[in-house]
Amino acid sequence: MFSLLKDHPFAVEAFFEQSYVLSFAAPKEALQKLIPECLSLDTHDDKWAFIAVAMVQTKGLRPKGFPAFMGNGFFLIGYRIFVKYISKEGRRLRGLYILGSETDKKKMEFLGNVFTHYHYKKTNIQQTIKDDVVHIADDASGLSVNINTRDTNVSLPLYSPFADWKEARRFAGPLPFTFSYNPGKKNVLIVEGVREHWIPKPIEVISHIIPFVENLHIKGLILANAFVIKDIPYYWKKGRTESWTAR
């Protein structure tokens, strides 16, 4: 029974006040080992695969249809890989595979680990803003990210594999689907997200230290793009499970 609760058993809605997403590129061979057998990497030029770090201020997280005052607010950092999945019906779905999640609220850590497979951990995330520079830090883990939100004419990060920001937006997230996998039962859990008014804006990353990503020891990792989205109503449909066989 408890395992069924983790399969996103009901629809959920929330409001993203702002979401800063940093996407890192690596040779696809370096990320292949991090995803389950049912998924394939979503690549650029059949060479680069991507891991994203999303830092999201969220409010009003609650079962869909419940009044807003019953919702929870929290800060979330999600670590995910861009992937593809071919469904039983033959549909090719783009989405994300979650490696881990961090939050500043103990309640969110508990509920997140009851109702999802996203590996929530409570940390000491703090966000401050001074002179148009956003500083996101965790004194426990050593995470530190500084983002310049003032400039409107932002260049792609040095060594980015993308030719321009239009090309880079394909790997901005969030994507329509999130996948989890039970290798023992060979079941894939598919959660579909629905968003509105999604306009990602390029941002400049002044500096970044992200221990979770560094501890994966990914060779050839480079910052590929960075975006912010603001004021986004979002909801996730109830999760659905299907059996997987190699196809």
Regions found by a protein language model. Give the residues of each.
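Interaction-surface and assembly-scaffold signal
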Residues: F2, H117-R247
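N-terminal intrinsically disordered, low-complexity segments enriched in P/E/S/T
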Residues: F2-K6, E13
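A domain-level signal for the structural core that forms small-molecule/cofactor-binding pockets
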Residues: K6, F74, N225
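Terminal, regulation- and interaction-focused segments at domain boundaries
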Residues: A11-Q18
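Secondary-structure boundary elements
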Residues: P27-L41, F82-R92, S243-T245
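Aromatic- and glycine-enriched beta-alpha-beta binding-site module
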Residues: G60-S141
